[in-house]
Structures are given as C-alpha cells and as structure tokens.
Amino acid sequence: MQVQATAKWVRVPPRKARLVAEVVQGMPVTEALSVLSFMTQAAAGDVGKVVRSAAANAENNFNLDRDRLQLLRVDVDGGPIIKRFRPRARGSSYSIFKRTCHLRAVVEDNLDRPTRQRARAPRPAVAASDPAASVDDEEE
C-alpha cells in the first residue's frame, strides 16, 4: 500500500531540493531519516519533514509498521516564483527570483512488493588455455 504526504510552497529552490531527494529515494524510511539528519543542505530538513509526515500517515491512518516502510520516491515540483527587485545605479534594477517548490513523499510497505529473483545470464566459458601463451603465439 502506498501512502503519501505533501508540502507545498516550500522556500527552497527545486534544483537544490532534488539533489537531496535523489540521495534518499528507495531507502527504508528509518535509514532515509538518519541520512537526512546528517546532511548539511538546507533542503534536507524540509525533505525529512515530508518523509516523517508520510511515515506518520502510514502508521496512524493505515496501521502500517514504521520499520517496514520503504521510501518509494520523493517528487520535487517547481512552485510559484517570488519576484523581488534590487535597486542598481542610474535608476536601473536587477531582478531577484526566490524560487519555491512542492514536495511529495511516497512510502510503501515493503512486504507488499513481491521480491523478484533476477535471472542471471550464463557466463561465457573461460578458455582452458593460458592467456599468456596465446599472446606469445601471436607475436611469432
């Protein structure tokens, strides 16, 4: 079962939030929160807040065990841009764009997903002869 939580109009640029979100995608929730707590980026606090909220939604609304939750994905979408102007010389001005983003964390109970066994391709047969001997034959 997938459970989600959203945070809108977060005052972090989407580009910086995506850098943090890519690190924790696919991790177990407890491990992701531990990693986020040690990250120095400002967006780590906001991403952690959304992940904690999604885990709390799963725990309280759907009676799922917090230790079995897997962070499926963290979506970062661009929000509205706050525009400000900085006065410059001779009556001109520079634009300042304060970007915002919308965050959505999706967690799921990792026992719901069936575990797949990857079929391994057969390895090519290794030649019985010594590779060094074949190099000597080619030089002659």
Where are these regions (language model features)?
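Structured, basic alpha/beta domains of bacterial-type, RNA-associated proteins
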Residues: 1-136, 140
